[in-house]
């Protein structure tokens, strides 16, 4: 028999949905990262469209109430014609370039830790509000059963969409996790610390005044790079989230010690900027203790954290050496 083409019939089983529902992430706090990065992308787009009259309108609001978590932004919103593609289909994202999110698989991450996900959105210029209900509890039951389903069959079984009138000048996206049973997600202090170390927010005024601004005066190039960073105003239960860096720390002798001046650097290849960053030490060049949440040098892309504080540990000859520094590396090469 000669070579012949045989037709195929590709399908995706139900366990693909399990991956999209956060099964690949061991840390439940990633839920905050996924939704905030989507909000930041939407806010960036809204800003580019001139929808904000004031900078403080570029805001993400996170609220914990009882066992519910809500993440709300005033970004561009999802257009009515794109709701099914963006909020029901899997991995349809068209994001490129300066978008923090990429593949369109993060929106169901919270379904691993709650009984129901609710997405509400309205796009600027459209008189509609769309609401998507995803029954996460039912989805988990189906995935745990021995019944065989294709992924799209399960999505149809657990998802509903409704539409109602909305004012055309409204633009927003809101995701609510109902009946959250993962206690770490409901822990306000843990959530605020995770957000401060992860999402693209600005530094506190005191840290900028005492550590960064004096160094910027001597390094105008890096001040320009800093001003070009993506930042969003993130509020948690009404309180603003800032990066956790401070101008003083408590050392191993339980004494308060000042952080020294910031030093800047950049990485280039054949004249092309790959990354830039800053670092600092204590005035006495002592180690930052484990109680200092911002110790070590961190990696960021589009001002969103990549990995955690241990990312660069293998570059030091001794593990302890990494604790002498604080700082950030901002990758800019795509």
What residue ranges belong to the model's regions?
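Glycine-rich, histidine-containing beta strand-loop boundary motifs that form or position
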Residues: 34-35, 64, 73-75, 109-114, ...
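P-loop NTPase nucleotide-binding/switch module
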Residues: 4-20, 24
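Conserved ATP-binding N-box helix of the HATPase_c
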Residues: 23-61, 106-112
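Interdomain "switch/hinge" adjacent to the Bergerat
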Residues: 1-11, 46-100, 125-295, 304-305
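Conserved, well-folded catalytic cores of nucleic-acid-processing
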Residues: 39-42, 89-94, 116, 120, ...
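AAA+ P-loop NTPase catalytic core and its hallmark functional loops
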Residues: 19, 31, 37, 84-85, ...
């Amino acid at each position: 028999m000669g070579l012949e083409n045989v037709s195929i019939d590709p399908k995706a089983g139900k366990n693909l949905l399990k991956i999209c529902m956060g099964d690949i992430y061991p840390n439940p706090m990633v839920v905050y990262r996924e939704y905030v990065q989507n909000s930041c992308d939407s806010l960036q787009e809204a800003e580019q469209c001139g929808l904000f009259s004031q900078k403080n309108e570029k805001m993400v609001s996170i609220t914990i109430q009882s066992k519910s978590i809500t993440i709300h932004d005033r970004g561009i919103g999802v257009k009515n014609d794109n709701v099914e593609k963006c909020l029901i289909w899997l991995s349809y994202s068209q994001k490129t370039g300066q978008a923090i999110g990429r593949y369109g698989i993060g929106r169901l991450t919270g379904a691993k830790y709650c009984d129901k996900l609710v997405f509400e959105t309205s796009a600027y210029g459209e008189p509609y509000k769309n609401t998507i209900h995803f029954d996460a509890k039912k989805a988990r039951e189906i995935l745990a059963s021995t019944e065989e389903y294709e992924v799209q069959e399960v999505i149809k079984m657990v998802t509903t969409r409704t539409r109602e009138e909305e004012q055309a000048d409204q633009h927003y996206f809101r995701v609510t996790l109902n009946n959250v049973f993962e206690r770490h997600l409901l822990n306000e202090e843990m959530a605020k610390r995770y957000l401060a170390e992860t999402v693209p927010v600005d530094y506190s005024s005191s840290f900028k005044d005492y550590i960064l601004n004096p160094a910027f005066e001597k390094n105008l190039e890096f001040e320009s790079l800093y001003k070009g960073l993506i930042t969003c105003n993130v509020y948690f239960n009404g309180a603003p989230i800032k990066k956790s860096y401070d101008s003083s720390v408590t050392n191993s002798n339980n004494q308060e010690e000042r952080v020294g001046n910031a030093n800047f650097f950049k990485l280039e290849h054949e004249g092309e900027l790959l990354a830039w960053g800053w670092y600092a030490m204590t005035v006495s060049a002592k180690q930052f203790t484990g109680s200092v949440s911002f110790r070590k040098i961190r990696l960021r892309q589009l001002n969103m954290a990549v990995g955690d504080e241990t990312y660069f540990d293998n570059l030091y000859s001794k593990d302890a050496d990494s604790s002498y520094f604080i700082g950030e590396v901002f990758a800019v090469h795509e």
